[in-house]
Curated annotation (Swiss-Prot):
Gene name linked to the record: calB
Record has NAD as a keyword: yes
Pfam family, one: Aldedh
Protein name: Coniferyl aldehyde dehydrogenase
Keywords, sorted A to Z: NAD, Oxidoreductase
Record's signal peptide: none
SUPFAM superfamilies: ALDH-like
Superkingdom of source: Bacteria
Record-level GO cellular component terms: cytoplasm
UniProt KW Signal keyword: no
Organism, scientific name: Pseudomonas sp. (strain HR199 / DSM 7063)
């Protein structure tokens, strides 16, 4: 099979395996990366992004049809650089062994953090830079090499990444594989030392099956239907502003975007009014507004319109926030207005499938327990968002629901913090990265026990057994502390 792959050059399946072999060989022959080399890789990644940020923003926008330049610089470039700088600042401390108490006299116990080797990275299209270089911050800090497979849905960005990576890194440090889903399947079947995938749940199942053949450990960053749970104690204007800020950012094409809102039935009209007012102020027009991002491709554009048609057919009321009353459907630039959907029912597609767009279903409740029960009836989401000042209700969300993260009185801000792990649970993913959590994910925590020559750690195991072992066993098997 021929693929468009390694650093932009056509390669076959065997060449992909050979490239991985070269990276593994270099890792073994050159030994674990020391602090100086780790810092060098982090510095080169930072330089690559900063020195080429305008070209990257142009490529991303061309792939989307229109992608806000500021959103690319803020999230993809600045977000990546922040994670890389955090790793650069702390990696020396992270590398230090952890010393532990040894139970045997004369022994020393510690944990050393050893590089895994070569990590495979499969990154998505919605944030094609930060969801590649965010993981790489931990991968490089841990002393690994990496092979990156960016999304085929952003071909200009992926090709530019391949070109830049080849310029800033040796091919045995970081290399790029370009290609479609068939290439992605081949990539995920390689015997990496670890594989991280960011994307949808359905594809993640195939990734896990392929990785299992080589017993490759995986980190899966997925998505799901992240709920917004609004208390009666919440400020509805603040809720609407914070929720709609994220729901319209990148046109809602975010794994952590609010997927539906649960609010008290008497607050529905207030929320709709505040949301409409706020969105109109942010985006007085949509069609030619460079701040408002297009849907990535026709397939996803049609999918979102299918959700709207389905909701209307099943009794939903669709509230399109289109202040300039522009005709968007036939514009050719694939923009969909921010849209609220009320009178929703559980059989609607918008309440059963991850939306990944600027559509926001609103479901009302009478008592807070029913809101909790509704969240728990769904698969575990990547995040849950609670708004309100009622401490009892807040604790119910924290204790009675399970999600990758909980954010109180805000949306998505946790992902900006490298001091917190980023990851899902259940159908929203497994494993985590960011900061020290990424360093640990991409390291082998190797226990080391050093016994002194006079140590007695295994004397009790030596035959013949007599009074000494019986006395020891009586102590070890006692119920007393």
């Amino acid at each position: 099979m021929s693929i468009l792959g390694l650093n932009g050059a056509p390669v076959g399946a065997e060449q992909l395996g050979s490239a991985l072999d070269r990276m593994k060989k270099a890792h073994l022959e050159q030994g674990p990366a020391n602090l100086e080399l780790r810092l060098s890789r982090l510095d080169r990644a930072i330089a690559m992004l900063l020195e080429n940020r305008e070209a990257i923003a142009d490529a991303v926008s061309a792939d989307f049809g229109n992608r806000s330049r500021e959103q690319t610089l803020l999230c993809d470039i600045a977000g990546s650089v922040a994670s890389l700088k955090d790793s650069r600042e702390h990696v020396a401390k992270w590398m230090e062994p952890e010393h532990h108490k040894a139970m045997f006299p004369g022994a020393e116990a510690r944990v050393e953090f050893q590089p895994l080797g070569v990590v495979g990275v499969i990154s998505p299209w919605n944030f094609p830079i930060v969801l590649a270089f965010g993981p790489l911050a931990g991968i490089f800090a841990a002393g690994n090499r990496a092979m990156l497979k960016p999304s085929e849905l952003t071909p200009r960005t992926s090709a530019l990444l391949a070109e830049l990576i080849a310029r800033y890194f040796d091919e045995t440090e970081l290399t790029t594989v370009l290609g479609d889903a068939e290439v992605g399947a081949l990539f995920s079947a390689q015997p990496f030392d670890h594989l991280i995938f960011t994307g949808g749940t359905a594809v993640a199942k195939h990734i896990m099956r392929a990785a299992a053949d080589n017993l490759v450990p995986v980190t899966l960053e997925l998505g799901g239907k992240s709920p917004v749970i609004v208390s009666r104690s919440a400020d509805m204007a603040d809720v609407a502003q914070r929720v709609l800020t994220v729901k319209t950012f990148n046109a809602g094409q975010i794994c952590l975007a609010p997927d539906y809102v649960l609010l008290p039935e008497e607050s529905l009209d207030s929320f709709v009014a505040e949301a409409t007012r706020f969105v109109a102020a942010m985006y007085p027009s949509l069609l030619d507004n460079p701040d408002y991002t297009s849907i990535i491709n026709a397939r996803n554009f049609d999918r979102l319109h299918r959700y709207l048609t389905d909701a209307q057919a099943k009794g939903g009321r669709v509230i399109e926030i289109n202040p300039a009353a522009e005709e968007l459907g036939d514009s050719g630039i694939r923009k969909i207005a921010p849209t609220l959907i009320v009178n929703v029912s559980d059989e609607m597609l918008v309440l059963n499938e991850e939306i990944f767009g600027p559509l926001l279903p609103i479901k009302t409740y009478r008592d807070f327990d029913s809101a909790i029960d509704y969240v728990n009836s769904k698969q575990r989401p990547l995040a849950s968002y609670f708004f309100g000042e009622d401490a009892v209700e807040r604790e119910q969300v924290l204790k009675r629901t399970v999600s990758g993260a909980v954010v109180v009185n805000d949306v998505m801000s946790h992902v900006m913090m490298d001091t917190l792990p980023f990851g899902g649970v259940g159908h929203s993913g497994m494993g985590a990265y960011h900061g020290i959590y990424g360093f640990r994910t991409f390291s082998h925590a190797k226990p080391v026990l050093v016994q002194s020559p006079v140590g007695e750690s295994n004397l009790a195991m030596r035959a013949p057994y007599g009074e000494a072992i019986h006395g020891l066993l009586s102590v070890l098997l006692s119920t007393e502390c």
